[in-house]
Curated annotation (Swiss-Prot):
Sequence similarity: Belongs to the Nth/MutY family.
Pfam families linked: HHH, HhH-GPD, NUDIX_4
The organism's taxonomic lineage, starting at the top: Bacteria, Pseudomonadati, Pseudomonadota, Gammaproteobacteria, Enterobacterales
Any one GO MF annotation of this record: adenine/guanine mispair binding
The protein's name in its UniProt record: Adenine DNA glycosylase
Cofactor(s) this protein requires: [4Fe-4S] cluster
Length: 350
């Protein structure tokens, strides 16, 4: 399919069916588009909307975000996952405040230099917010292009990604780029979906190679399968009435900056930790274990609950706090921690 025909059909479809009233599309600014694009990485629109609205209510400008404590940013992000995005968001906002006087940069080089911003995100900000001619290549766009032009291979491989970037550059029109890029994302999200694509509703159906050969399931190529390693983590749930002991993780690494239960690889390490702090472990109780899966490994979590008689226990741990179940502080929590805290709120641990 010729590039001009491709873009014309996509734009015509967008005018009729595309999404035009998402929260970040109303009174568009580079800040709003950037925030939404970061949140939308590996996350569905319906999940992102309430988070975006809460962020905009609390941080209406990039300067507000830059001046906020990281704990508060992570707290508002809790449940959205991939917390490196939130940490990079905060760093980038501070960079905008420091280097650009709080005005969001408007050149590709400056935007791409922000933490957590790659080529596609920079292109999305420039095209969607400012109408500048930059292509994008998010997951939805990759899927549409790979199927239409039968691009084999996993897009995570550099040569496949380069082929898709070349196609994206070719089909992105000189005019109407903001509508076109939004249309491509909408097309992938609404019509050219991962499973059960609605090919009969697609404006590219007649020129799509995958549709012609009924081979959409082959494109894009899947990531080579690998068996995820398994690890075990013993979580220590120290409870004093309605207070639960949490410690802040280091700034980088797994759950960086979030508040979590003390974690150990083995139960004897957990008991040794308690003994060193003169905490009686007679009433230590194992709760139901469960699995939490990361992108690169499975973590089998074994919660170990222990009621304590004093808040003084373990408060020499630096960045630690007693989390009040009735009046939760504004701190970021890892998803398994939130799950266990909710379990403790409902009453006796099981």
């Amino acid at each position: 399919m010729q590039a001009s025909q491709f873009s014309a059909q996509v734009l015509d479809w967008y005018d009729k069916y595309g999404r035009k009233t998402l929260p970040w599309q109303i009174n568009k600014t580079p800040y709003k588009v950037w925030l939404s694009e970061v949140m939308l990485q590996q996350t569905q629109v319906t999940t992102v909307i309430p988070y975006f609205e809460r962020f905009m209510a609390r941080f209406p400008t990039v300067t507000d975000l830059a001046n906020a404590p990281l704990d508060e940013v992570l707290h508002l992000w809790t449940g959205l996952g991939y917390y490196a995005r939130a940490r990079n968001l905060h760093k980038a906002a501070q960079q905008v405040a420091t280097l650009h006087g709080g005005e969001f940069p408007q050149t590709f080089a400056e935007i791409a230099a922000l933490p957590g911003v790659g080529r596609s995100t920079a292109g999305a900000i420039l095209s969607l917010a400012l109408g500048k001619h930059y292509p994008i290549l998010d997951g939805n766009v990759k899927r549409v292009l790979a199927r239409c032009y039968a691009v084999s291979g996993w897009p995570g491989k550099k040569e496949v990604e380069n082929t898709l970037w070349t196609l994206s550059e070719q089909v992105t029109p000189a005019r109407g780029v903001e509508r076109f890029n939004q249309a491509m994302m909408d097309l992938g999200a609404m019509v050219c979906t991962r499973s059960k694509p609605k090919c009969t509703l697609c404006p590219l159906q007649n020129g799509c190679i995958a549709a012609a050969h009924e081979s959409w399931s082959r494109y894009p190529g899947k990531k080579p399968k690998q068996t995820l390693p398994e690890r075990t983590g013993y979580f220590l749930l120290l409870q004093h009435n309605q207070e639960i002991f949490l410690a802040q993780r280091p700034p980088s690494g797994l759950w960086g900056g979030l508040y979590c239960f003390p974690q150990f690889a083995r139960e004897d390490e957990l008991r040794e930790w308690l003994a060193q702090r003169h905490v009686n472990a007679d009433n230590l109780t194992q709760l139901n274990a469960f699995r939490h899966t990361f992108s690169h490994f499975h973590l089998d979590i074994v919660p170990m609950w222990l009621p304590v008689s004093s808040l003084d226990a373990c408060m020499d741990e630096g960045s630690a706090l007693w989390y009040n179940l009735a009046q939760p502080p504004s701190v970021g929590l890892a998803a398994p921690v939130e799950r266990l805290l909710q379990q403790l709120r409902t009453g006796a641990p099981v």
